[in-house]
């Protein structure tokens, strides 16, 4: 297991790992399951083509961001996320922004057998457009699929216009992205 609170982030750091990630991260080895505890920022900035995240738990997450926030990544493009669970709280303060439990923006990304349990808080002081989702704030592209996943989320939002979209699983689903067997 890894305790993210042992990593010193500067106030200006908005993620733990900046830039593009194209590798794989798995939380299991030799039959043992591992977790990352106490995330205070999203783990990745960008998951890019070929990246895979699997079999990992994020526990006691407490993220307070000022812009696009989620536990795993701000952006996932052509990524594969399987058997990932997040437990805790993710919030944005300041300017209205996108927020989700797992990934902020997913494009042509497949998320399978993953979950979020906890609270998502979005700023309610502005009327700027934003998306809030239990798992993904915005999921788009014909190759995007959210399947066999769930969110048990308390969503605290103060939407003031029809440009502020809030969903239990996904805040905004577009461009032929699909959800199957998820709740």
Give the location of each predicted region.
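Surface-exposed repetitive/solenoidal architectures
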Residues: 1-183
């Amino acid at each position: 297991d890894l305790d993210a609170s042992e990593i010193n982030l500067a106030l200006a750091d908005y993620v733990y790992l900046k830039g593009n990630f194209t590798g794989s991260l798995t939380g299991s080895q030799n039959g043992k399951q591992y977790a990352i505890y106490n995330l205070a920022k999203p783990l990745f900035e960008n998951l890019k083509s070929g990246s895979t995240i699997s079999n990992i738990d994020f526990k006691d997450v407490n993220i307070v961001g000022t812009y696009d926030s989620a536990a795993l990544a701000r952006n996932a493009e052509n990524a594969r996320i399987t058997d990932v669970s997040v437990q805790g709280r993710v919030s944005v303060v300041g300017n209205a922004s996108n927020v989700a439990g797992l990934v902020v923006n997913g494009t042509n990304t497949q998320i399978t057998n993953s979950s979020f349990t906890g609270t998502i808080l979005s700023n309610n002081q502005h009327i700027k457009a934003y998306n809030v989702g239990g798992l993904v704030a915005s999921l788009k592209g014909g190759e995007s699929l959210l399947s066999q996943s769930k969110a048990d989320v308390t969503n605290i939002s103060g939407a003031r216009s029809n440009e502020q979209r809030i969903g239990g699983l996904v805040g905004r689903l577009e461009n032929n992205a699909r959800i199957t067997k998820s709740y």
